Swiss-Prot record:
GO terms for cellular component: actin cortical patch; cell cortex; cytoplasm; endosome membrane; nucleus; plasma membrane. Pfam families: DUF1720, EH, WH2. Gene3D superfamilies: EF-hand. Component of the PAN1 actin cytoskeleton-regulatory complex. Residues 1356-1368, 1705-1736 have a biased composition (Pro residues). Disulfide bonds: none annotated. This is Actin cytoskeleton-regulatory complex protein pan1. InterPro entries: DUF1720 (IPR013182), EF-hand-dom_pair (IPR011992), EF_hand_dom (IPR002048), EH_dom (IPR000261), WH2_dom (IPR003124). SMART domains: EH (SM00027), WH2 (SM00246).
Length: 1794
């Protein structure tokens, strides 16, 4: 170990003898002094003191700081706490300065500088209570601190002397002495080795001589009694002995008892030498151990932990070290165990691994020493009175381990006094203390003189100190205190300090330097070794040991310091008494330091390695080869390697002559050899030859022939070197001529260099083994070409590639499988045998062998050879054989027909043999045995020749008694059993056998059961333990998994962690939001339900109570009256309309007679479908009808306003306000209407697949003119389908179709939509401004629209357009009432309509008014007040309330605007029912959003605006046929301006966003046979087959299916809410192509699921054929549909036109699943309408006002069936067949209303 200290001569830098001087033991004590066995060495953990003592601490690591008792010395100065040496700052310098290692600047002649009691220059700071200003003290630092240093010299030594622990004296600051720390001994703590560095003297400077300015020598020195030194157990650890603190702390402690301060432990076992640590380390460990445990023999776990922790090793390693060290598992460490722990810690600190188990040798040694200690202990050995604090143990250990890390013993000073506590001094002076111990006691008195010098007791010394005192004072000269001389000593004058301190004085100043030791003699020797000063007291002799600590400070070198005490003798100054005590002993001490100086080199031990500098060469002997590399030049001496060779540096001095000059260089022999080296490296084995000589071999070796006789035969040994020797060597071959001939001898050895020729590697290919040694042939891979490639190719997942390229030439491969081959084959087998079955099946083998690319035949043959026993699989050996055969084949060898013996696997071979043997035994043994044959001879002894064998045979147990001669081999008796021949007598033996077998089986069963029970018991017994173990394992697994998870998460970056946290937060928020949404949904649902219940309170009261009955009766009566009134009004209006229509028709006929004739002829030619013809013929002769103004909010209007589903966009033509004068131009209008009707008829026919006779091109007519056109005609057509048919025949159908809204009906432009729609309603009347089918009719046409467009039930026939395939309308659209009509581009609601949309609350009222009143009133309004309506904003999208016009399912986009016809006119005739128009694509259908709220389910067939027809058509295609008749395809005629509510309703459908509100009243069952629809001009439905709008039933304005009134008639419950968008209620409001009619989709069965497929098939069958007569049809159609009161009276809640339920038997409830909608709120008043003709009493009871819940209740009671009152309107549209010609009853209109 190298030490940072310069003094590395000894273990810690104090000489080769570890600082022990002759005549002194290791502790510096005279050998004859027993009991003073102080430890020599300083604590390995000690480090230089900090200015205030130990590094970072004020006390020794293991000392508890005792309160520094401040002594009030006689001078009245508070004594400084002991140990607080003021000037420890210089102690560091003094640390190792003793041997001059440290600067001698302060050659504190004071007692051993460590003791600094000598003239420690630091005394200056140590004002020993003397006048501190007297820095005259040593070094100016000693600010006149009186002779403070002297104090140490004389009295100074007194407390400081305590052990040199004069520092302790410092605490005694007898106010003067205290500062006197000059004893500096505080620094002297070196006694504790801290300051021991004699060089520490400088520190004395800081040691203000405890003399405070008051320098009162009178300070009672008694406190100084070095007796405190007792506490200073000299033991190095005694330094920790708290008692030492007494130097300053303990009041004049009793003189140290003869305590063996040096050796606390009496156990001799402690002296046992442990081999695994060095002696020095063991000594250090012993010191540490003793200082830690005090007087105890074992170290507690707490202190052990404190010490171990300071090593800063990981906790895991410390735990392991403790476990390994505590061999007795007692929780305490004895000394050997502690050494073992320190040893292990040292391993850890040096980076070496700590073994898991202590090596047996070390363990045995430790255990032996532990046992010895255990046996040697006294049962009552002293226990430590005060345990060492754990913190102290940690500090001490830190210093220890710090020393390890520094590779130098930590300065023993570490234990130095804690600054005030002088405690360190204890250790330093402990020896002295012992010296002062009993001997010191006198010293006390010795000090007393000093004290008297300082105090009266010092009197004698006083003089000694007085000079100092004066010296400390500026007038140090007077030195009154007896220190005066010293003072001069501190100053130059101090030198004369005769006063016994004189030397010290000089010591205090440079002159004092000698005085340092307090002994002038020491000063010369000391100058470093002030150690003698220690002995400032005769008792100090024992203190020598006290110096040992100093020595430890110096470590062993301190021993000489002991002798340093001899100089103390000169310390006569103040110490004269002590000096005598010190003299003899001190004398040697003085010299102690001189020797130390050389020891400083400490190289002696290190030199040992140097000595071995050649040792490494030892191995070089061998041929010098090692030397050659390392030596090269150095090798020249080669002494190493062969001491004898050293002379032979040349390697062959004798040979040198023979070497010729060249050999001289050979001296370097190695240099040339260097190349040879390489040659020789192979020679390494040849060491035996020339090993030593090799370097110098060359010729000189010749005589030596390798220096070894054995080499002589190896003479050739050099020949190989010759190649390496450079050419010159060649001649030298061996440097010996004799070797020359031998050179051949080396040829074999050429392996060294020329071994290359000896490539005997050829031997490798020669396989070994015998043919039978399967798998043991040792053939090198070099002889097996391609085997590696084969192995790689056969591995799983190997890239496919042929092996043929690897095997290109034929090579003879031995039959036997070599070891390498077998290894490769086994690897392949293991790679494929994933399940470790031990066999590979055919599939795997096929895949493997297939890699070889051999033919299938060859592989089959190989398989057959290898698959022994035909198992279908190959085991490991068989697989190897197969691969070997493949390998041979790849190398060009043929596959043998039979496996050679070498290839027969042992397992197979042996198995076969065994099997054969067993077979033979089975076959032959039992049948051929002859029990009584020769082999069955008796083995009994024959006792007599006369014995009769026959007599003994029966008793002979050696004979086989059973005779099997008759027995044959086993033959199954079941083969040819002949039951007949079986004899009964054979049974008993069988039974017996069976019984015996049963008994044996029972026995076996019993035995097995016992075994099973035993196993169960064992298992049960083991179960708890297993469970516990399993639980613990599971717990461990979980904990490990948790740890893994934790580590994996902890290793993640903060970003990931934050993101995870964020994700969790978001997830939590999402889940919370979802739950909140669910709660809100539930809340909404519950509130909606409560709202509905609140609104429906009338339905909730007890229906059976008298009050309820009375209420119902009153309601029914009132409604019946209203219905009667409405019926009458409707009838009147109908009659008026009829007349009006008739007049118009007549006019038209008159003007268009030729065309009409042609039409009739055309119809008669069967060109038109029969049903169409019937309808046309049934149309009544047009009669002029009195124009009646009808309120626009008629259902027909609303439905007309619904956009036609056609995608063709027609610009919305706004009906300009038309004055009544517009009607004057009836002829023009009639012509235009006719043209439009003809066009529509052609479109219808085209849609039905009938080629129209001619396509009526709408004659262009100005919008105004169109609007001015009399609306009556369409109205009549709407009212009278039959008439419409007739009108059609005379081209009137076009007129009637267009009448509903003449100008607007004809959309000017049809914007093509993606799907080609039937141009129904697309045909533009040139006379009218083009309006989109979906757009509201031109306001100008509003008057007509009010009357006709709303009244017309069927749009005029449209030219048939190729029907697009029926779009697969989603069930949702089918299920729900008209989906929110996505307003098609062509179905733009008029702005008026949009603006007029009623608010939601108003919607119902409007529905009520519209549905109830608008049916007839709208007709009347339209007829009577067409001009007025024209001025009103028409709801272009509002379908006619009356005419849910069934439009052929032609593409919605192509649907031509269907002009509503007069309510009385049936305009359906133009539309042949046979061919349904192609349904619009689903995409074009508005989602099946309930466009109509409950009130929207107005049973009236709403007539849709031209554009709305097509949309209705497409959706209707999915409706059941019955419903299709009511499809809400509005007539293309633009609706007349509706009442705002109606307009709103009509426009509502345009609002696609409005969700479909399924109304509990929405009809849900398709109306198979529509009955008279109130005020709905059935013309559309009549005129069009159900296929036109297969999906739509009768629809109200809102687009919802027409709610059937109680009478079963569809009631026109058109919500007329002014502002709310009616999208939810009136899908026909704008007839958006995609919007399914609000009617329950025809495609829904009773469960509202798709039936439209079937129903569409029936569309054509259910088409409107014809009605019996127009009047009857109109009566039935409008009888129940007439508004309860004229639409013109919006305030009144319109009631269903149907008569009260009581008035007539209620027809079966309409098939709608939802009851008719409650009456809507009254519609806004509109133009007064002619009272509708009274409805026939026989008609079904009118549906109560849709907006009235009581009406709804009445409807329910009358039979109207509520199917589902749900938010989603799944009600089926009331879609009966328009005209069910099959039954020939006009009641077919009601379809399935019942």
């Amino acid at each position: 170990m190298s030490y940072p200290n310069q003094m590395n001569g000894s273990m810690y830098g104090y000489g080769a003898n570890n600082g022990v001087q002759p005549g002194f033991d290791s502790y510096g004590m005279p050998i004859n002094q027993g009991g003073m066995n102080y430890q020599q060495q300083t604590y390995p953990y000690q480090q230089p003191y900090q200015p205030d003592g130990y590094a970072g601490n004020t006390m020794l690591p293991f000392q508890q700081s005792q309160p520094a008792t401040q002594f009030n010395n006689g001078f009245g100065y508070a004594s400084q706490p002991t140990g607080s040496v003021a000037d420890y700052g210089q102690q560091q310098q003094q640390m190792y300065g003793y041997n001059g290692m440290m600067p001698q600047t302060m050659n504190n002649t004071g007692f051993m500088q460590p003791q600094q009691t000598g003239a420690i220059p630091g005394f200056a700071p140590q004002p020993t209570g003397f006048v501190q200003p007297q820095p005259t003290g040593f070094m100016s630092q000693q600010p006149a601190s009186f002779m403070q240093p002297q104090r140490t010299g004389g009295a100074g030594f007194i407390q400081p002397q305590r052990t040199g622990a004069m520092p302790a004296y410092q605490p005694q600051m007898n106010n003067f002495m205290q500062p006197q720390k000059t004893g500096g001994f505080a620094p002297q703590a070196t006694g504790f080795m801290q300051t021991q560095p004699f060089g520490a003297a400088p520190s004395f400077a800081p040691q203000p001589t405890g003399f405070v300015q008051p320098q009162q020598t009178g300070v009672v020195m008694p406190p100084q009694p070095t007796g405190y030194l007792q506490a200073q157990p000299t033991g190095p650890f005694a330094s920790f002995v708290q008692p030492q603190q007494t130097a300053s702390f303990m009041p004049a402690a009793q003189p140290l008892k003869p305590q063996k301060t040096g050796q606390i432990h009496n156990s001799k076992a402690m002296d046992t030498r442990l081999s695994f640590v060095s002696a020095a380390d063991q000594a250090k460990f012993e010191q540490l151990f003793k200082s830690a445990v005090g007087r105890e023999e074992a170290m507690s776990s707490e202190i052990g932990k404190a010490i171990l922790v300071r090593s800063k090793l990981p906790t895991v390693q410390l735990s392991k070290i403790w476990r390994l060290s505590d061999t007795t598992r007692s929780g305490r460490l004895l000394f050997p165990q502690f050494v073992l722990a320190m040893y292990l810690c040292n391993l850890g600190l040096t980076g070496k691994p700590i073994p898991d188990k202590v090596p047996d040798g070390i363990l045995n040694e430790v255990n032996a020493m532990v046992d010895a200690i255990s046996f040697s202990l006294d049962e009552n050995y002293a226990k430590p009175t005060q345990p060492i604090p754990q913190a102290a143990a940690q500090q001490m250990a830190a210093q220890m381990f710090g020393g390890f890390q520094q590779a130098a013993g930590i300065p023993s000073q570490i234990t130095g006094f804690q600054p005030q506590a002088m405690m360190p001094q204890r250790t330093g002076m402990q020896p002295q203390m012992t010296g002062f111990q009993q001997p010191m006691i006198p010293q006390r008195t010795g000090m007393q003189p000093q004290m008297t010098g300082f105090q009266q007791p010092m009197m004698p010394q006083r003089t000694g100190l007085q000079p100092q005192m004066t010296g400390f004072q500026q007038p140090m000269v007077p030195q009154r205190t007896g220190m005066q001389p010293q003072m001069t000593g501190f100053q130059q004058p101090m030198m004369p300090q005769r006063t016994g301190l004189q030397p010290q004085m000089t010591g205090f100043q440079q002159p004092m330097v000698p005085q340092r030791t307090g002994m002038q003699p020491m000063m010369p020797g000391l100058q470093q070794p002030m150690a003698p000063q220690r002995t400032g007291m005769q008792p100090m002799m024992p203190q020598r040991t006290g110096m040992q600590p100093q020595m430890t400070g110096f470590q062993q070198p301190m021993a000489p310091q002991r002798t340093g005490m001899q100089p103390m003798m000169p310390q006569r100054t103040g110490m004269q008494p002590q000096m005598p005590g010190m003299q003899q002993p001190m004398a040697p001490q003085r010299t102690g330091m001189q020797p130390m100086m050389p020891q400083r080199t400490g190289m002696q031990q290190p030199m040992a390695p140097q000595r071995t500098g050649m040792q490494p060469m030892m191995p070089q002997r061998t041929g010098m080869q090692p030397q050659m590399p390392g030596m090269q030049q150095p090798m020249a001496p080669q002494r190493t390697g062969m001491q004898p060779m050293m002379p032979q540096r040349t390697g062959m001095q004798p040979q040198m002559p023979g070497m010729q000059q060249p050999m001289a260089p050979q001296r370097t022999g190695m240099q040339p050899m260097a190349p040879q080296r390489t040659g020789m490296q192979p020679m390494m084995p040849q060491r035996t030859g020339m090993q030593p000589q090799m370097p110098g071999m060359q010729q000189p070796m010749a005589p030596q022939r390798t220096g070894m006789q054995p080499m002589m035969p190896q003479r050739t040994g050099m020949q190989p070197q010759m190649p390496g020797m450079q050419q010159p060597m060649a001649p030298q071959r061996t440097g010996m001529q004799p070797m020359a001939p031998q050179r051949t001898g080396m040829q074999p050895q050429m392996t060294g260099g020329p071994m290359l020729p000896q490539r005997t590697g050829g031997m490798a290919p020669q396989p070994t083994g015998m043919p039978g040694q399967w798998g043991f042939i040792n053939t090198p891979l070099s002889n097996l070409p391609g085997i590696e490639a084969l192995g790689q190719q056969m591995m799983p997942n190997a890239p496919s590639g042929g092996l043929n390229n690897t095997f290109q030439q034929k090579k003879d491969i031995p039959w036997a499988i070599s070891k390498e081959e077998k290894r490769i084959y086994d690897q392949i087998f293991d790679a494929w045998d994933k399940e470790r079955k031990g066999t590979l099946g055919g599939n795997a083998v096929l895949e493997i062998f297939g890699q070889s690319k051999l033919t299938r035949t060859e592989l089959e043959h190989i398989w057959n050879l290898c698959d022994h026993g035909d198992k279908g699989s190959l085991d490991r050996d068989e697989f190897a054989v197969a691969l070997h055969l493949i390998y041979r084949k790849l190398n060009g060898n043929e596959v043998p027909a039979v496996l050679p013996p070498e290839l027969i696997p042992p397992s197979t071979r042996n198995f076969t043999e065994s099997l054969n043997q067993v077979k033979n035994l089975i076959k032959n043994d039992t049948s051929n045995r002859k029990p009584f044959g020769a082999e069955n001879q008796s083995k009994l002894k024959k006792n007599s020749f006369y014995d009769n064998p026959s007599e003994t045979t029966e008793k002979d147990a050696t004979l086989y008694r059973h005779n099997d001669s008759d027995a044959s081999a086993y033959v199954s008796s079941a083969r040819r059993r002949d039951f007949k021949e079986e004899k009964i007598e054979s049974a008993p033996p069988i039974i017996n056998d069976i019984d015996s077998e049963i008994a044996s089986l029972k026995k076996r069963i019993h035995e097995k059961s016992l075994v099973v029970n035993a196993l169960e018991d064992k298992k049960l017994a083991a179960t708890p333990a297993n469970d516990v173990q399993n639980d613990s394992l599971i717990y461990r697994i979980k904990s490990v998994q948790d740890e893994i998870n934790r580590l994996s998460t902890s290793n993640k970056s903060p970003e990931v962690a934050s993101m995870n946290v964020r994700l969790e937060e978001l997830s939590t928020r999402v889940s919370k939001m979802l739950s909140d949404i669910n709660e809100v949904d539930h809340t909404i649902a519950s509130l909606s339900l409560k709202l509905f219940q609140a609104e429906d309170t009338k339905n909730s009261y007890d229906q059976t109570s008298p009050e309820a009955t009375q209420e119902r009766n009153r309601t029914i009566s009132s409604k019946l009256a209203e219905m009667e009134k409405q019926k009458n009004e409707s009838k009147a209006a109908l009659e008026q309309m009829k007349n009006y229509v008739t007049n118009i028709e007549n006019n038209i006929r008159a003007k268009l007679l030729p065309s009409a004739a042609n039409d009739d002829a055309w119809l008669s030619q069967n060109v038109v479908d029969e049903s169409v013809t019937r309808v046309v013929k049934e149309l009544p002769v047009p009669a002029p009808a009195a124009p009646q103004t009808l309120n626009p909010p008629s259902v027909s209007t609303v439905q007309q306003s619904k956009p036609i589903e056609s995608n063709t966009h027609t610009p919305e033509v706004k009906a300009t306000s038309e004055s009544p004068s517009a009607s004057s131009n009836l002829e023009d209008r009639a012509a235009r209407i006719k043209a439009e009707a003809q066009r529509r008829m052609n479109e219808r026919l085209a849609a039905l697949g009938i080629k129209p006779r001619q396509k009526g091109t709408p004659s262009p007519a100005p919008v105004n003119s169109a609007t001015s056109t009399p609306v009556a005609a369409p109205t009549a057509q709407q009212i009278q389908p039959g008439k419409q048919a007739s009108a059609v025949s005379s081209n009137v159908p076009a007129v009637s179709a267009s009448i509903s809204t003449p100008p607007a009906v004809v959309p000017t432009v049809q914007h093509p939509q993606p799907t080609k729609q039937i141009p129904t309603a697309a045909v533009k009347d040139p006379s009218t401004t083009s309006t989109s089918f979906n757009t509201a009719p031109i306001p100008q046409q509003a008057p007509l629209e009010n009357q006709f467009s709303k009244m017309s039930l069927e749009p005029p026939v449209r030219p048939a357009v190729p029907t697009s395939p029926k779009p697969q309308i989603p069930d949702s659209s089918n299920v729900h009432a008209p989906p929110p009509p996505v307003q098609p581009m062509n179905a733009m609601p008029s702005h008026n309509a949009v603006n007029a949309r009623p608010s939601a609350p108003e919607r119902r009222d409007s529905f009520g008014s519209v549905s109830s009143g608008s049916n007839v009133s709208s007709i009347e309004d339209e007829t009577s007040t067409m001009p007025l309506k024209a001025s009103q904003p028409t709801n272009p999208g509002a379908p006619s309330n009356h005419a849910p016009q069934v439009v052929p399912p032609a593409p919605m986009h192509a649907v031509a605007p269907v002009q509503p016809k007069a309510p009385g006119m049936v305009t359906n005739a133009p539309a042949p029912s046979s061919a349904p128009a192609p349904p619009a694509p689903v995409s074009q259908l508005p989602p099946a959003v309930p466009n109509v709220p409950v009130p929207s389910m107005i049973p009236s067939v709403a007539q849709q605006p031209p554009s709305s027809v097509a949309p209705a058509t497409a959706p209707s295609s999915t409706l059941p046929p019955s419903q299709s008749s009511f499809a809400h395809v509005p007539s293309p005629a633009p609706p007349a301006p509706q009442h705002p509510s109606a307009a709103a309703l009509s426009s509502a459908p345009a609002d696609n966003s409005m969700p479909h509100r399924s109304s509990p009243y929405a009809p849900q069952e398709p109306v198979q046979k529509p009955q008279a629809i109130n005020n709905i001009a059935p013309a559309t439905n009549l005129g069009t087959s159900q296929s036109f709008s297969p999906r739509m039933g009768p629809v109200n304005n809102s687009g919802s299916p027409l709610a059937m009134n109680a009478a079963g008639q569809p009631s026109l419950a058109v919500p007329a809410v002014p502002s709310a968008p009616s999208n939810h209620f009136n899908p026909f409001a704008k007839m958006q192509p995609p919007a399914p009619s609000p009617l329950q989709p025809s495609g829904h069965d009773s469960d509202n699921w798709s039936q439209h497929g079937d129903e569409e098939e029936e569309d054509s069958e259910d088409d409107i054929r014809s009605s019996k007569d127009a009047a009857a049809l109109a009566a039935k159609l409008f009888g129940g549909m007439a508004p309860a009161h004229p639409v013109s009276t919006p305030p009144v809640r319109p009631q269903s036109a149907a008569p009260p339920q009581m008035s007539a038997p209620t027809p079966p409830p309409p098939p709608m699943s939802v009851p008719p909608p409650p009456s809507a709120p009254p519609m806004p008043a509109g133009p007064p309408s002619a009272p509708p003709p009274p409805l026939p009493a026989s008609s079904a009871p009118s549906v109560p006002n849709p907006g009235d819940r009581s009406a709804l209740l009445q409807q329910i009671h009358t039979g109207t069936r509520l199917k589902k009152t749900v938010t989603t309107d799944k009600s089926k549209p009331i879609a009966g067949r328009v005209l069910d010609a099959s039954d020939g009853n006009s009641s077919a209109w009601y379809g399935n209303l019942s």
